[in-house]
């Protein structure tokens, strides 16, 4: 099967991620004002509970099944066999997880039971998800367009129908059901690439067992966030969960933008690994340096615009977002870097046990720190706990990659920090004279980009370094 070009894949994924990025920028202000911190907290708390079940139901989707498919793209018979075996394995697992979820919420949940019930639709969406097939065959057009339509549906419902806390159920139902509906086009186009074959039950079992190794990698981004939100909900209040969730939603938008390139590169890097190409190490190093050039200014930019941004975006009830973001902003650099090293090196070369060990230890550290620090410092304790955990993991990752002689371009990184700090100073001065409006924020972003790019060109920053 002929794969789409890397350029085309990046365009389609970039378009989808742009829409995915823009949608929350429109919906979050509406939801924050309609539901308030406590309403946002209820939605976030229930979603983070279902996230633990989704981690199991979606095991292997992004990081394993697409690689299995990528190895079979040139043989239609083998490709078809792999697809149906993976799909059946996923389907049985997800339906079992859904049954477990229903039992848990029936026994333990009294308040807001309907909200928790509707969140369970996400697990049905995970059961039907076949995006891994299109990722493995490097055909991102169909899933990207389908996801764009789904984002449009969510946006329309929020803008037209969400008015106050009585619309909580409608909102949760809408965002959950689109995860099911946006799979329909993927199934319709599937017949172009594969045919129906009998399921090999032995292979289904083998796939299931192998995919379990990717349980923690699959939930890397969500695991620690879920821990923070759940502990906040149990130890603190739904209002604190709402404020923390909204702040982290902004970070997630930035992280999603950075990870677009990462996800598109996985099938290509897998092929490099199979061919034992020496370009794997060089590609990893280049991608890390490019990522830092993008994320360093994002960190300083977020801190600079937040004092005026939160007022028009979240509302005055979310004032705690400003000091919270000052702590959390550095995660825009740390989390994508952690994920890049994990996806483009550790998982590609099958260092799954090492990766799982680091994530498990990180989860324990994060949980212990959350329980201790949230009790004393509330949402700021959750932020500090997450920051410490991610920093420990990053040090661990750097120790791993030094063994294959992957090095950062230190000079370039220092120049980026200098440029970003100068940009931060300029934005701080300009922000002092601007009103807290959307247009002022857009102007600040534009000024920040121009200042940063001019400083980069002045210092003649070398993106790739010497390898």
Predicted regions and their residues:
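Interhelical loop/hinge segments that connect adjacent transmembrane helices in multipass membrane
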Residues: 1-2, 6, 141-144, 168-175, ...
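N-terminal membrane topogenesis motif
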Residues: 1-23, 77, 191, 201-217, ...
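Signature of the first transmembrane helix
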Residues: 4-62, 98, 155, 175, ...
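Helix-loop junctions and terminal segments of transmembrane helices
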Residues: 29, 57-74, 251-295, 341-348
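Interfacial segments at transmembrane-helix termini and the short loops linking adjacent helices
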Residues: 105-121, 303-337
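Hydrophobic alpha-helical transmembrane segments
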Residues: 120, 144-192, 360-365, 379-400, ...
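Membrane-interface junctions at transmembrane-helix termini in multi-pass inner-membrane proteins
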Residues: 123-147, 330-361
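Transmembrane alpha-helical segments of multi-pass transport proteins
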Residues: 362, 411-466
């Amino acid at each position: 099967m002929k794969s789409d070009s890397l350029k085309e894949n990046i365009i389609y994924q970039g378009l989808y991620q742009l829409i995915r990025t823009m949608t929350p920028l429109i919906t979050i202000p509406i939801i924050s004002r309609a539901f308030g911190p406590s309403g946002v907290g209820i939605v976030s708390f229930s979603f983070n509970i279902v996230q633990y079940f989704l981690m199991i139901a979606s095991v292997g989707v992004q990081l394993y099944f697409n690689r299995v498919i990528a190895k079979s793209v040139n043989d239609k018979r083998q490709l078809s066999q792999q697809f149906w075996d993976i799909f059946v394995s996923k389907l049985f697992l997800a339906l079992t997880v859904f049954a477990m979820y229903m039992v848990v919420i029936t026994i333990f949940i009294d308040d807001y039971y309907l909200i928790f019930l509707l969140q369970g639709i996400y697990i049905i969406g995970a059961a039907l998800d076949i995006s891994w097939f299109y990722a493995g065959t490097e055909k991102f057009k169909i899933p990207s367009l389908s996801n764009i339509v789904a984002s449009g549906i969510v946006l329309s419902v929020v803008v037209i129908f969400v008015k106050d806390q009585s619309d909580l159920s409608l909102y949760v139902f809408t965002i959950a059901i689109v995860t099911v509906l946006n799979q329909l086009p993927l199934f319709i186009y599937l017949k172009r690439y594969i045919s129906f074959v009998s399921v090999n039950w032995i292979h289904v079992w083998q796939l299931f067992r192998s995919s379990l190794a990717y349980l923690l990698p699959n939930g890397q981004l969500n695991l620690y966030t879920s821990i923070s939100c759940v502990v906040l909900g149990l130890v603190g209040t739904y209002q604190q969960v709402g404020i923390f969730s909204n702040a982290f939603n902004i970070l997630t938008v930035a992280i999603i933008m950075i990870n677009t390139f990462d996800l598109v590169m996985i099938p290509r890097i897998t092929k490099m690994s199979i061919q034992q190409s020496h370009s794997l190490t060089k590609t990893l190093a280049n991608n890390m340096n490019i990522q830092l050039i993008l994320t360093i200014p994002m960190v300083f930019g977020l801190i600079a615009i937040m004092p005026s941004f939160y007022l028009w975006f979240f509302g005055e009830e979310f004032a705690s977002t400003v000091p919270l973001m000052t702590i959390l902003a550095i995660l825009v650099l740390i989390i994508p870097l952690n994920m890049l090293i994990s996806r483009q090196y550790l998982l590609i070369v099958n260092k799954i046990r090492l990766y799982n060990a680091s994530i498990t230890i990180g989860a324990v550290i994060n949980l212990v720190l959350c329980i201790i620090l949230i009790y004393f410092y509330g949402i700021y304790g959750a932020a500090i706990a997450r920051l410490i955990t991610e920093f420990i993991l990053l040090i661990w990752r750097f120790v791993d990659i030094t063994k294959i002689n992957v090095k950062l371009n230190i000079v370039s990184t220092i120049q980026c920090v200098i440029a970003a700090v100068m940009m931060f100073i300029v934005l701080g001065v300009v922000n002092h004279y601007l009103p807290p409006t959307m247009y002022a924020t857009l102007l600040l972003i534009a000024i920040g980009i121009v200042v940063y790019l001019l400083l980069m060109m002045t210092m003649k920053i070398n993106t790739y370094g010497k390898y």
